[in-house]
Amino acid sequence: MFLSEAGARPRAGEASASERRKWVKVFKACDEDNKGYLSREDFKVAIVMLFGYKPSKIEADAVMSSVNPNTSGVSLEGFLSAVKRKKEARLYRNEIRQIFTAFDVHYRGFLTLEDFKRAFSRVAPKLPARTVLEVFREADQDSDGHVSFRDFEYAMNHGQSK
């Protein structure tokens, strides 16, 4: 039993028609020479336009590594796929934030074992106290008795990959 099994799954699904139109419009705006693809710099500008931040080198490298060797950039379909994945990751992170906030009833910015016990007693009342303690200890990365949002997010994502 791990935190991610409590139901925090990304909502996979197709982008709405209006979102897709917006993404295509941004792609076309950044593809100034109508090459049919976005260069690394074009891609970065497009991400700034859509998400409000410049992607890291690692993020840009990940997208550029999937580029067709016959072109010098990301095709429209590759761009749409990357943007969809990024949107889903953002939704999932927001969902994790909401779960953390629901656990943090005292608005301290961290969770204690008591917070875990209270939350799990509501969502899984038959769960043994030993299991709740194990989950808390696994989430408490530095064993300081507090689970920060970063600890919580890591635990949720770690549980997703199991």
Curated annotation (Swiss-Prot):
UniProtKB keywords: Calcium, Metal-binding, Repeat
PROSITE patterns in the record: EF_HAND_1 (PS00018), EF_HAND_2 (PS50222)
CDD domains named in the record: EFh (cd00051)
InterPro entries noted in UniProt: Centrin_CML-like, EF-hand-dom_pair, EF_Hand_1_Ca_BS, EF_hand_dom
Alphabetized GO MF terms: calcium ion binding
UniProt xrefs under SUPFAM superfamilies: EF-hand
UniProt domain EF-hand: residue ranges: 18-53, 91-126, 127-162
Gene3D superfamilies per the UniProt record, alphabetical: EF-hand
One family name in Pfam for this protein: EF-hand_8
Lineage top rank: taxon: Eukaryota
Binding site for Ca(2+): D140, D142, D144, H146, D151
Leader sequence residues: none
Record's protein name: EF-hand calcium-binding domain-containing protein 11
Organism, as annotated: Mus musculus (Mouse)
